Curated annotation (Swiss-Prot):
The lineage of its organism: Eukaryota, Metazoa, Ecdysozoa, Arthropoda, Hexapoda. It comes from Aedes aegypti. InterPro entries: Mediator_Med17. This is Mediator of RNA polymerase II transcription subunit 17. Component of the Mediator complex, a coactivator involved in the regulated transcription of nearly all RNA polymerase II-dependent genes. Mediator functions as a bridge to convey information from gene-specific regulatory proteins to the basal RNA polymerase II transcription machinery. Mediator is recruited to promoters by direct interactions with regulatory proteins and serves as a scaffold for the assembly of a functional preinitiation complex with RNA polymerase II and the general transcription factors. Coiled coil: none annotated. Keywords: Activator, Nucleus, Transcription, Transcription regulation. Its main location: nucleus. One of its GO terms (molecular function) is transcription coregulator activity. It comes from the Eukaryota. One of its GO terms (biological process) is regulation of transcription by RNA polymerase II.
């Protein structure tokens, strides 16, 4: 008998080759870990085969048991066949494996719901009748509408009963509306209001207080009856009186209607009028009662009194060449010689005065807006002071004045920074500018209407300052716009005019409009001469001489005439043109012929070449010549005098 030998079978140490690169490098596969090796071995076990083997073992065991029983009966009892020694261990492992499988299934079912899905058994859908649904919804909407209508009727009935029991609006509601627009405070048992502009920066000494009380029924009835009677007397109809539960008591000096009237007079005739008031503010609050109108009128009176008081104080303090006069409620200041500015405070306590409501024909809205704006700026300066820089600097100097040291301002610049205009000085300056501008407009319109040739057009700048306006004047000839267009710009200031011509010349004029008229007439004469020279060049005529100020002839009080002398292309014809502007434009045209027909040689002058000096000039009747305007006539004249040879 051969002796058995133990042979160990092990996996090769060398790993398997996973990939061979192009350069021959071999990439090996890493050896599996213990867990991977265990999983690989477990995957090779066939548990179903194991179960079948167990069944076969059980059947064989049963057969052996039966055979043993038979043998025990026949054979001796002291002998017993032995079973497989690991049978009990195997059975316990099998039971444990079964329990683990059951536990795994239970955990899988509990964790993943897909193992147990309850699918309901589909049933046939019931037949839906659409008309039944429509009737059901209609019935539900009808019941809801009935509930809402019933509630609305109840609210309407309650409101009607409440309105019938109360003749006037609630006092607290009216007080709330009053508090939205006016400052109120409670002093003891009294409600006091404030009409002044102190919160806006006003320093007027009048307190401007009013008292708010609760109106009694008898007072309401009396006021409504008187208001209705007055309305019937004026209009003939009886509107419904507006009831109120508030009563406003204003001081006596603030009752009524007040406005400031500014008039520019010349020889007791009004040139310009502006009225300052704040009426019409009650239209912004349609729900307000009679108290709103009363408070608006009272605040307007306070505003006008404050403005007039400030103007009167400045009129007394200013040192003008012609002193301002303050008499009663009237301030008189001199704008220009013979022209005065009258500022009046009109205050009427009677309710039937309609002077303020009458329309004014020559009302200047710009001046009215300026009066409002100037007082608002005065209030703004009282409350808004420039911040000091640095923080330790004194409060008061402006930022520009603080930079005077680092910027090295001189004495003149420092004096200019300290200058400021008062309200009255600004109003006087604006009134002077308005008067000067109107006179300039009148002069330009008059010249444009009187002078038909050439045409004068004025374009006023829409964006102007209150003390300076700008107008551009264009002088053109109809049909000859391409030859020449004379343009000049005039700056209208308070007491002077500044003219800037096209060639850059600047001329300063006073407020006398005769200087402006003379300047425009001079520009017209220059335009005619320069445009004629341009036309002569186009027609090949020669310009022999040109003079802007002709020094011969009669002396003119408003300036000398302009002239030019033209020669034909063959130099056989001469044209002399003279344009005068006193008192209106006057054009004279003279012609001469060369050689002269009246030349006769004598003993002293024997050469025939002396006849080309030209003959005497003859004046033409310019008004009888054919043509639409001056340049058209001159074009026809030069064309007819041009020789063909």
């Amino acid at each position: 008998m051969s002796v058995s030998a133990n042979i160990s079978v092990e996996a090769p140490i060398e790993s398997q080759i996973q990939e061979i690169a192009y350069d021959g490098t071999e990439i090996y596969q890493l050896p599996p870990t213990l867990s991977e090796h265990l999983a690989k071995c477990a995957a090779k076990i066939d548990f179903s085969k194991t179960v079948n083997d167990l069944d076969l073992v059980k059947q064989s065991i049963k057969k052996e048991d039966e055979k043993k029983d038979d043998d025990s009966k026949d054979a001796a009892a002291h002998f017993q066949s032995s079973l497989w020694p690991w049978d009990s261990v195997r059975n316990k492992l099998k039971d444990a494996f079964t329990e683990v499988c059951v536990l795994s299934d239970v955990l899988a079912i509990a964790k993943e719901k897909r193992f147990m899905v309850l699918d309901p058994i589909p049933q046939e859908p019931p037949e839906v009748k659409q008309m039944v649904q429509v009737y059901a919804r209609k019935k539900a909407l009808a019941s809801a509408a009935n509930i809402l209508l019933t509630g609305a009727e109840r609210l309407k009935t309650a409101h009607t009963d409440q309105g019938g029991n109360r003749s006037a609006p609630d006092f607290h509601i009216e007080l709330l509306r009053l508090r939205r627009n006016w400052r109120l405070k409670k002093v003891s048992n009294t409600i006091i209001g404030d009409l002044s502009y102190r919160t806006a920066g006003s320093k007027f000494m009048h307190p401007g207080m009013f008292e708010v009380t609760k109106a009694e029924d008898e007072d309401n009835n009396d006021e409504n009856a008187s208001a209705a009677a007055g309305t019937i007397a004026t209009t003939g109809t009886a509107p419904e009186p507006k009831l109120t539960s508030l009563k406003v008591n204003v001081p006596t000096e603030l009752q009524g209607v007040a406005f400031i009237k500014v008039i520019t007079q010349k020889d007791q005739g009004d040139l310009c009028t502006a009225t300052l008031n704040m009426m019409g503010s009650t239209q912004l609050f349609p729900q307000a009662g009679e108290w709103q109108k009363t408070l608006d009128f009272a605040q307007n009176v306070l505003f006008c009194k404050e403005l007039f008081n400030q103007l009167a104080r400045e009129a007394v303090q200013l040192q003008a060449p012609i002193p301002h006069v303050v008499v009663g409620n009237q301030i008189r200041a001199t704008l220009l010689p013979g022209i005065q500015l009258v500022i009046s405070l009109c205050h009427s306590t009677s309710s039937d005065s309609n002077n303020s409501s009458e329309p004014i024909k020559d009302h200047d809205h710009v001046l009215e807006h300026s009066l409002h704006q100037l007082l608002r700026e005065f209030h703004h300066k009282n409350t808004h002071h420039p911040f000091p820089h640095p923080a330790s600097a004194p409060l008061g100097p402006s930022k520009k004045r603080m930079l005077a040291g680092p910027s090295a301002f001189d004495r003149y610049e420092l004096l200019e920074m300290t200058k400021s205009q008062t309200l009255l000085e600004q109003i006087i300056a604006q009134a002077q500018h308005i008067f000067t501008r109107r006179r300039a407009q009148y002069v330009l319109d008059t010249l444009a209407r009187e002078v038909k040739d050439p045409q004068i057009t004025s374009h006023w700048n829409a964006m102007n300052s209150p003390t300076m306006s700008c107008v551009k004047i264009n002088i053109t000839s109809h049909g000859y716009d391409a030859n020449l267009r004379t343009s000049l710009v005039i700056h209208v200031k308070e007491r002077s005019l500044k003219c800037i011509c096209r060639d850059g010349r600047i001329m300063h004029m006073s407020y006398e409009m005769q200087e402006l008229r003379d300047l425009i007439l001079y520009q017209i004469s220059q335009h005619q001469i320069v445009c004629l020279q341009s036309l002569a060049k186009c027609m090949a005529w020669q310009i022999l001489s040109n003079s802007s100020h002709l020094g011969i002839g009669s002396v003119e009080p408003l300036g000398n005439a302009s002239s030019c002398v033209l020669a034909s292309p063959n130099s056989d014809r001469l044209i002399a043109v003279q344009v005068r502007c006193d008192p209106q434009l006057d054009v004279k045209v003279y012609i001469a012929q060369s050689p002269g027909k009246d030349f006769f040689p004598g003993s002293l002058v024997q050469g025939r070449h002396w006849e080309h000096l030209g003959g005497h000039f003859k004046e033409l009747r310019f008004d009888k010549m054919e043509g639409k305007n001056f340049h058209n006539k001159m074009e026809f004249l030069m064309a007819s005098l041009t020789s063909q040879t």
